[in-house]
Amino acid sequence: MMRVSEEEAKRIAERLNYRWPDRTVVAVAQEYKSGKVLMVASMNKEAVIKTLTTGIVHYWSKSRKELWVKGATSGHVQVLEKFYYDCDADSVLLVVRQASLIACHEGYRSCFHYKVEEGGVKVEEPSYE
């Protein structure tokens, strides 16, 4: 689990460019072991600081307009292993250990289970690697 001091977390959070109208950055969660992209969400400054200081991933819910801990109710917690931000400082990559076999609220390992193929869309079977 990766954690930093509150002082360092605030310094990092200040470097980010919260350019969207709701003052968030794009957050991509990638599974530590497999490298699989699990989900994309949003983080505001508070979510970044809480994630970095606790080692447990927090997001900003655009629909509910509130901070949420991934897995607080479902048990599908994400533990932070690495934290990166991009060259524009408006997106972050969270390398996480998914505490369960599910990251998606639809019950799949990844939110990216709709595969567009010639002839239509295929829903991939759940993969619990």
From Swiss-Prot:
Compartment annotation: Cytoplasm
Functional note: Catalyzes the hydrolysis of the adenine ring of phosphoribosyl-AMP.
Family: Belongs to the PRA-CH family.
Pathway involvement of the protein, from the record: Amino-acid biosynthesis; L-histidine biosynthesis; L-histidine from 5-phospho-alpha-D-ribose 1-diphosphate: step 3/9
A Pfam family per the record: PRA-CH
Record PANTHER family: HISTIDINE BIOSYNTHESIS BIFUNCTIONAL PROTEIN, HISTIDINE BIOSYNTHESIS BIFUNCTIONAL PROTEIN HIS7
Protein name, entry field: Phosphoribosyl-AMP cyclohydrolase
Species of provenance: Ignicoccus hospitalis (strain KIN4/I / DSM 18386 / JCM 14125)
UniProt xrefs under InterPro entries: PRA-CH (IPR026660), PRib_AMP_CycHydrolase_dom (IPR002496), PRib_AMP_CycHydrolase_sf (IPR038019)
Any one of the GO BP annotations: L-histidine biosynthetic process
SUPFAM superfamilies the UniProt entry points to: HisI-like (SSF141734)
EC number: 3.5.4.19
NCBIfam families in the record: PRK00051.1
Reactions performed catalytically: 1-(5-phospho-beta-D-ribosyl)-5'-AMP + H2O = 1-(5-phospho-beta-D-ribosyl)-5-[(5-phospho-beta-D-ribosylamino)methylideneamino]imidazole-4-carboxamide
One GO term describing the cellular component: cytoplasm
S-S bridge residues: none
Main location (coarse class): cytoplasm
Residue numbers binding Mg(2+): 86, 88, 90
